[in-house]
């Protein structure tokens, strides 16, 4: 049973990352390698912030914002500086490697006995008795579903429709008087925000040490 739960947890963790990659590779047709840097960015931020006593839920929000900033910078490099999409992602990925090490201060961070989304007083109270072994799986499932439904909601907004249109036919979007570059930047920001969240607190149930590099 432990092995099955672990597989489910890892699958749902990577499902959030897959949502972000789906936006860049499938919707925008943008080979974004920024995710190689924004993925461990979530680990670095979460480990540092929760070690300073920050609320775990707030850390998720901060991690998403940090990933969104990374995606925005990739978009700006591509759109404003006219750098090829693949190269702009490589530039940001390389920069984030240094940023992640700077944030963490070391190559790996211990996370023993820290208050996280999976180890706090509320979780111990709600998931007691027979539910205790399923606590991590249920929490990850809830977070994954929230991310999925929020993305579905966004994709049904005007901005979401424009995002899909840019990936299908940039000419139509331009003819509507919409800056396709701005839409690309928004898409990259959301995608990298999701990727960062996937490695924030979601790795904590499976390890006692977060690897940054």
Identify the residue ranges that each predicted region occupies.
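Alpha-helical transmembrane segments in multi-pass membrane proteins
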Residues: 14-18, 38, 42, 46, ...
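Short, non-helical or kinked segments that cap or interrupt transmembrane helices
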Residues: 26-42, 77-91, 159-162, 208-209, ...
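Membrane-helix/interface signature in polytopic inner-membrane proteins
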Residues: 149-189
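Conserved small/polar residues in nucleotide/adenosyl-binding loops
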Residues: 200-206
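Membrane-interfacial amphipathic/re-entrant helices at transmembrane-helix boundaries
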Residues: 1-17, 45, 52-58, 129, ...
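Transmembrane helix-bundle core of multi-pass membrane transporters
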Residues: 85, 89-92, 96-156, 185-186
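Alpha-helical transmembrane segments within multi-pass membrane transporters and channels
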Residues: 54-94
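Transmembrane alpha-helices
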Residues: 17-20, 95, 174, 179-199
């Amino acid at each position: 049973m432990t092995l099955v739960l672990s597989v489910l947890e890892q699958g749902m963790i990577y499902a959030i990352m897959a949502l972000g990659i789906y936006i860049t590779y499938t919707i925008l047709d943008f080979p974004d390698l920024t995710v190689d840097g924004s993925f461990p960015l979530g680990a670095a931020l979460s480990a540092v912030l929760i070690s300073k006593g920050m609320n775990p839920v707030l850390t998720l929000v901060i991690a998403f914002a940090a990933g969104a900033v990374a995606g925005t910078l990739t978009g700006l490099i591509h759109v404003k500086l006219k750098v090829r999409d693949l190269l702009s992602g490589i530039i940001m990925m390389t920069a984030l490697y240094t940023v992640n090490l700077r944030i963490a201060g070391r190559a790996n961070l211990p996370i023993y006995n820290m208050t996280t989304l999976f180890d706090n007083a509320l979780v111990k109270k709600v998931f007691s008795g027979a539910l205790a072994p399923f606590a991590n799986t249920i929490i990850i499932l809830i977070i994954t579903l929230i991310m999925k439904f929020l993305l579905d909601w966004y994709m049904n907004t005007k901005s979401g429709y424009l995002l899909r249109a840019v990936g299908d036919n940039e000419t139509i979007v331009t003819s509507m008087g919409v800056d396709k570059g701005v839409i690309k930047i928004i898409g990259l920001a959301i995608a990298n925000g999701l990727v960062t969240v996937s490695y924030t607190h979601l790795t904590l149930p499976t390890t006692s040490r977060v690897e940054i590099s």
